[in-house]
Amino acid sequence: MLMNRIRRWTLLALASLASMATTPALANSSEFETEFDRALGTQARAPKAFAPSYASELERLVALSAEGSRGRIGVAALDLNTGQSVSILGEQRFPMASTSKIAIAATFLEGVDRGRWSLDASYPLLMPMRSQPFSTRVAPVQAGQAMNARQLINIMIARSSNPATDALLRVVGGPQAVNDWAKRAGIKDFRLDRDIATLVRDDGEFDPAVHIDERDSTTPNAMVEMVSGLYQGRWLSQQSRDVLIGAMERTVTGKRRIPALLPENVTVAHKTGSLNNTSSDVGIIRLPDGRTIALAIYATGQGSRLAREQRIASIARTIHDGVIITSPHRISSAR
């Protein structure tokens, strides 16, 4: 009987060695040990436990807040004063939804700085017309009330107006013009494909909690790079920068997201996004002592919009508290 077990173990060993080239080492080890114990009657081993590695204690805490068992959650944050950064699924793509409006506004404002357009010029709102999902490549719109560009930027950011966004998107030349601006700014992993009317009309084709659609998508890392660069005036004049950041500070949407759990003495400039089974918030947190944090949080799934918003609020507070209590001398950059 023992010799039969030994022969069986030998065959298992040879089979395991032969499979190592095509299967993961950990899987081979676990399966081999299980069969070994079964063949020789030895005591089963405790399963191996591997602790995830984090670049800092703050990143570990954010990862706990962003645990995504009920849908993907992507987070990126950067302390503009110290360089401390956090990235949880920061390189994974998420639907931009209305957070893309930051880039659309920036594209128009770059044109203002170059003398192509004026903030005082008026353009009509583009109102969506009734149409069936996917019935046309571009959703039909019609001209509405005319407003000057300064007003359009304010309501497209602060109130997330879709007709105002599409008005300026048409002025700059459509989605490709915005992609070109992002490319000039050196921002990778940013892709705008559709106007807002089409995006909203055709929403629901995929579930972002389990499916990555590269159309109209970005990564949390890319959006943190974008908002930090805009805040620091890297690509726009001071006047244009102030127009955009000022509109973000006046945002009235997403009160249950980034600002929800932050102290009242913290200034928040942000832009929200919402589509089928996804909620997001991207912006700047400015602390009373002058420290400034750029952050982007994209949440999918979680069972409800309220649950996603609660996750976003909790993550934002975790980042805020981590920056407050972490000494710069203990910071480990996670770039």
Regions found by a protein language model. Give the residues of each.
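Active-site SXXK
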Residues: 83, 95-125, 295
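A short, well-structured edge-of-sheet supersecondary motif
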Residues: 57-90, 285-286
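Short, well-structured active-site flanking segments
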Residues: 110-129, 175, 179, 237-240
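Structured C-terminal helix/loop/strand segments within mature extracytoplasmic catalytic/sensor domains
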Residues: 27-60, 65, 170-171, 175, ...
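Bacterial N-terminal signal peptides that target proteins for export
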Residues: 2-13
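Mid-domain, small-residue-enriched loop/turn segments at the edges of structured enzyme/sensor domains
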Residues: 72, 145, 153, 166-227
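Bacterial N-terminal signal peptides
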Residues: 12-21
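Second-shell loop/turn segments in exported
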Residues: 45-52, 87-95, 137-143, 151-155, ...
